């Protein structure tokens, strides 16, 4: 399963969460660590670049957040990111630099690398999206199959 490793899938220079991936082989191994990591990292972010808004929410001063967007912590919104109308960030979300979280898009327990685009009616849960990933309108990532059976990965 070499092609499914963090080393093969991601450019860790394109996220402020590089440290989160240290010591793991597969991307899903970081999922239970995202919230704690965000709190740790958030408390070290430079105050001249990030503003703390509420409990465990850090938003880059250069980011654009629509007034109708909802952000629950822990969350970090990176530099030049755009959080659009009615976006719903449920927590444990790290949104990379220049990323777009679109209208009516929902995030939960995610790392979005720099310049990721989830622009239209997406659900991104328990996921890691790499540099410049783009999800088409209405796309869903989730850790639960509709029939509740385990997912099997084969190569």
Where do the protein language model's features map onto the residues?
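Periodic glycine anchor positions in long extracellular repeat architectures
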Residues: 60-63, 78
């Amino acid at each position: 399963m070499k092609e499914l490793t963090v080393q093969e899938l991601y450019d860790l220079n394109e996220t402020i969460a590089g440290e989160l991936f240290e010591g793991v082989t597969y991307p899903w191994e970081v999922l239970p660590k995202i919230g704690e990591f965000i709190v740790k990292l958030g408390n070290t972010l430079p105050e001249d670049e990030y503003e703390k808004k509420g409990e465990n929410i850090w938003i880059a001063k250069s980011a654009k957040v629509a007034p109708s967007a909802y952000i629950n912590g822990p969350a970090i919104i990176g530099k030049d990111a755009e959080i659009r109308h009615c976006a719903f960030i449920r927590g444990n979300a790290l949104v990379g630099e220049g990323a777009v979280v679109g209208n009516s898009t929902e995030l939960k327990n995610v790392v979005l690398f720099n310049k990721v685009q989830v622009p239209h009616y997406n659900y991104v849960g328990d996921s890691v999206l790499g540099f410049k990933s783009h999800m088409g309108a209405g796309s869903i990532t989730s850790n639960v199959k509709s029939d509740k059976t385990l997912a099997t990965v084969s190569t």
